[in-house]
């Protein structure tokens, strides 16, 4: 496991990065290796029986919310969108054939059979995959390219997270216009109200209502399956669409126009990335069982049912999903669809929280407030800043685009762009992690990329129709993350140069016999081999040291979780000094007071390291950054980095330090 910088230097306002990955010089005292000896988490036996069924139902509520609500708008876009085709019998069979094979190839073959095998200690997703392949890259250019690729993929996921709640809830509420055309004007206001309540509810957490997400989606999939079977029974000839020849003849018959329809077909596989990203929550087997056992059959039946309806009534293309339902079941279907859309939205919102937490720990995002909303579930978190940004963007989309059909034009680019990034990173896994030969890895990569690129190109033509939004959102997020990374790296070098090797400092303390005062002083440092500048400033200005001085380093690693027995290394340095190095994965949030309180139980560094909270003072540095320094970073990036640093959550809050026990010392740094 390769070490990475900790999440923004703990000794700063939120600007300074960790320099732990930078050697402290040949004379530095060797710190315990943060990467040596780490073992894989204990492997649990694959779930079976009731446990497997429970996990599979849970996966329905989290993993399949996005792809599960696609029937609300997918075929409507294929036949009624700006690039849709006329719903003739041949076109209906052709589009349904493309739908079936897209689901089979992309979701079942690509993600289920291959991509989900590339896990980072059980975790999946763009950033986890980027961290996994980054360990094998030895060249600076190669690591930089992988970093840029992964960050852009993550940025696209944020665009996906903004669009999904808007399009899912809009698509569900639009059923009201089918049931009562006079109520069409109420669709947008009703959608806004639902989304406002959804984002306001986030601070309460999902611990209580999360248990019903799975059953809600179970009812949803059962409902769409029944509706689909009802449609198929009216015209079983739609089953001919399962033959790939209808898809091929569709392209031959419609040419370029037929190719553009892929921009609508791709909507049936939106959410495929969620299967991989949420792998750590449920495991591979429950996700596969839920897909093959219920989600895919239900979706396929519903799409075929909509197709059968279009064979019988081409005019139903204006909203084939709701027109598939009998009149008496329309309002119950709208209610179930709205509930499913809320569940799908919640899954994407929670995914954005998790992605941001990973980005912070991996050093690609400033610190933000992270609140744990459940004492039992470690992954249930709430990020207020992210929540309000997502909520504002979602409401703006609904008010700006007005209909799910218009939003569909914006949706595809984010999804297909992420798919391409995943394929490129997965190729590196096959070659570097699994050791596959070129002749074995390249054909699979080319096959995946051909399909991904076809979907992407079919969506690029929608740039003016709304495709610009996810690109703009991704470009903004990418700029912020890359700027933060570059700024942190530059600042890390400056802080390292301003520090002092630990062994030289310890020798100087022993020689000078500095006056000591009662109590414990804790200094946060990102470099285990060096002395933090704040300690040097404290000694220079105050001329005293506490009787116990603890140097704490928080090191983040490119794995999701660290085993508890390997969490902490501690040692006594002499002269009342102790060093504590704590290891965290990118899915974990450090709590320094709790960590120090646990040291006696861990039997590390002896009984002398017992921390008494009311006798302990935490010293942090607060740097004022200026943009007129020698760094080669462009001035506009320096200024952006400084703004981000000023608005980042304070180190004391992020690491859980008691505010009344924190002393901050200022310094000015020219970046």
Swiss-Prot record:
Main subcellular location: membrane
Family: Belongs to the HAK/KUP transporter (TC 2.A.72) family.
Name of encoding gene: kup
InterPro entries for this protein: K+_transporter, K_trans_C, K_trans_N, Kup
Biased segments, Low complexity type: 10-37
UniProt keyword annotations, A-Z: Cell inner membrane, Cell membrane, Ion transport, Membrane, Potassium, Potassium transport, Symport, Transmembrane, Transmembrane helix, Transport
Disordered as annotated region, ranges: 1-43
Protein name: Probable potassium transport system protein Kup
Role of this protein: Transport of potassium into the cell. Likely operates as a K(+):H(+) symporter.
Topology within the bilayer: Multi-pass membrane protein
């Amino acid at each position: 496991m390769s070490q990475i910088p900790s999440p923004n230097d703990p000794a700063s306002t939120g600007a300074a990065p960790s320099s732990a990955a930078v050697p402290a010089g040949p004379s530095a005292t060797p710190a315990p290796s943060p990467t040596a000896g780490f073992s894989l988490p204990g492997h649990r036996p694959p779930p079976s029986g009731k446990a497997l069924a429970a996990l599979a139902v849970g996966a329905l509520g989290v993993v399949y919310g996005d792809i599960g609500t696609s029937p609300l708008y997918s075929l409507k876009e294929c036949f009624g969108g700006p690039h849709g085709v006329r719903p003739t019998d041949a076109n209906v069979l052709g589009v349904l054939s493309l739908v079936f094979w897209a689901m089979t190839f992309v979701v079942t073959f690509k993600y289920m059979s291959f991509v989900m095998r590339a896990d980072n200690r059980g975790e999946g997703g763009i950033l986890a995959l980027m961290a996994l392949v980054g360990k094998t890259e030895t060249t600076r250019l190669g690591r930089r390219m992988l970093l840029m690729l992964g960050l852009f993929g993550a940025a696209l996921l944020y665009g996906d997270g903004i669009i999904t709640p808007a399009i899912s809830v809009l698509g569900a509420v639009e059923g009201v216009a089918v049931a009562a055309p006079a109520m069409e004007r109420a669709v947008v206001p009703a959608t806004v109200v639902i989304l406002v309540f959804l984002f306001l509810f986030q601070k309460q957490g999902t611990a209580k209502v999360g248990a019903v997400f799975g059953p809600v989606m179970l009812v949803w999939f059962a409902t769409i399956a029944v509706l689909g079977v009802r449609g198929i029974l009216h015209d079983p000839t739609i089953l001919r669409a399962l033959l790939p020849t209808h898809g091929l003849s569709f392209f031959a018959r419609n040419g370029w126009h037929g190719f553009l329809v892929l921009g609508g077909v791709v909507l049936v596989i939106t959410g495929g990335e969620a299967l991989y990203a949420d792998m750590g929550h449920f495991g591979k087997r429950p996700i596969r069982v839920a897909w093959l056992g219920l989600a895919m059959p239900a979706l396929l039946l519903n799409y075929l049912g909509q197709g059968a309806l279009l064979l019988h009534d081409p005019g139903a293309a204006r909203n084939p999903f709701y027109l598939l339902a009998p009149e008496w079941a329309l309002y119950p279907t709208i209610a179930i669809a709205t509930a499913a859309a809320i569940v799908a939205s919640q899954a994407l919102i929670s995914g954005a929280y998790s992605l941001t937490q990973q980005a912070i720990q991996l050093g690609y995002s400033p610190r933000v407030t992270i609140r744990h909303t459940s004492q039992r579930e470690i992954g249930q978190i709430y990020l207020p800043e992210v929540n309000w940004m997502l909520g504002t963007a979602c409401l703006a989309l609904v008010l700006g685009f007005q209909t799910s059909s218009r939003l569909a034009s914006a949706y595809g680019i984010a999804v297909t762009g992420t798919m391409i990034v995943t394929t490129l990173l997965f190729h590196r896994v096959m070659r570097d992690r699994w050791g596959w030969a070129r002749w074995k890895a390249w054909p699979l990569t080319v096959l995946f990329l051909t399909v991904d690129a076809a979907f992407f190109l079919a969506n690029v033509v929608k740039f003016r129709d709304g495709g610009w939004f996810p690109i703009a959102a991704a470009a903004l997020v990418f700029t912020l993350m890359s700027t933060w990374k570059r700024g942190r790296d530059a600042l890390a070098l400056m802080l390292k140069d301003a520090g002092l090797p630990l062994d030289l400092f310890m020798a100087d303390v022993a020689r000078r016999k500095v006056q000591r005062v009662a109590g414990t002083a804790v200094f946060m440092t990102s470099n285990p081999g060096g002395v933090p500048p704040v300690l040097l400033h404290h000694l220079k200005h105050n001329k005293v040291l506490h009787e116990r001085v603890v140097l704490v380093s928080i090191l983040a690693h490119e794995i999701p979780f660290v085993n508890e027995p390997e969490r902490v290394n501690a040692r006594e340095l002499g002269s009342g000094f102790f060093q504590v190095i704590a290891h965290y994965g990118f899915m974990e949030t450090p709590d320094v007071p709790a960590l120090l309180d646990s040291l006696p139980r861990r039997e590390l560094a002896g009984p002398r390291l017992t921390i008494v909270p009311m006798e302990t003072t935490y010293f942090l540095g607060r740097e004022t950054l200026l943009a007129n320094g020698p760094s080669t970073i462009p001035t506009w990036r320096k200024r952006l980095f400084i703004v981000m640093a000023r608005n980042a959550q304070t180190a004391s809050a992020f690491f859980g330090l008691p505010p009344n026990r924190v002393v901050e010392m200022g310094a000015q740094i020219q970046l």
